[in-house]
UniProtKB/Swiss-Prot annotation:
Reaction catalysis annotation: S-adenosyl-L-methionine + H(+) = S-adenosyl 3-(methylsulfanyl)propylamine + CO2
UniProt pathway annotation: Amine and polyamine biosynthesis; S-adenosylmethioninamine biosynthesis; S-adenosylmethioninamine from S-adenosyl-L-methionine: step 1/1
Coiled coil: none
Active site positions, chain numbering: 64 (schiff-base intermediate with substrate), 69 (proton acceptor), 84 (proton donor)
Similarity comment text for this entry: Belongs to the prokaryotic AdoMetDC family. Type 1 subfamily.
HAMAP family attached to this UniProt entry: AdoMetDC_1
Protein name (record): S-adenosylmethionine decarboxylase proenzyme
Gene Ontology terms describing biological process: spermidine biosynthetic process
Protein role: Catalyzes the decarboxylation of S-adenosylmethionine to S-adenosylmethioninamine (dcAdoMet), the propylamine donor required for the synthesis of the polyamines spermine and spermidine from the diamine putrescine.
NCBIfam families named among the record's database cross-references: SAM_DCase_Bsu
Length: 130
């Protein structure tokens, strides 16, 4: 039997209001709230403000990460949500971001990560990894 270790949502959000994505000050609370809405566990986050506009950010999660990059001049947000926890948590975080940013269109991909791992090769004794 094969197992997957996580789910990775990769999305391009088009037609987003530039006022929502021009500054890290505007978009960082949206991403922080998405983490909460997704029941994800934030370890740390970092946001960067580009000049004259645009922002990037990444949140390190206990489950993996959430990252984004914005191009306000195009109304574009590129987004990654990767979690090795409950798969529905990534969906909840994504749905929240869509609800708040209201893109006019979305290019969305969802991948099962590590899906070629065979269950019978799992190391269950931590001493075997030392």
């Amino acid at each position: 039997m094969k197992v997957a270790v996580g789910v990775h949502i990769i999305a391009d959000l088009y037609g987003v209001d530039a006022r929502l994505i021009s500054s890290s000050e505007a978009i960082s609370p949206i991403m922080e709230n998405a983490i909460q809405e997704g029941h994800l566990t934030k370890i740390s986050s970092e946001y960067y403000q580009f000049r004259p506009m645009g922002a990037s950010g990444i949140a390190l999660l206990a489950e993996s990460h959430l990252s984004f990059h914005t191009w306000p001049e195009y109304g574009l947000v590129t987004l990654d949500i990767y979690t090795c926890g409950d798969r529905s948590n990534a969906d909840r975080a994504f749905d929240y971001i869509i609800k708040v940013l209201k893109p006019t269109s979305v290019d969305y991909r969802k991948m099962e990560r590590g899906s070629q791992i065979k269950e019978d090769v799992r190391i269950t004794d931590p001493q075997m990894m030392l």
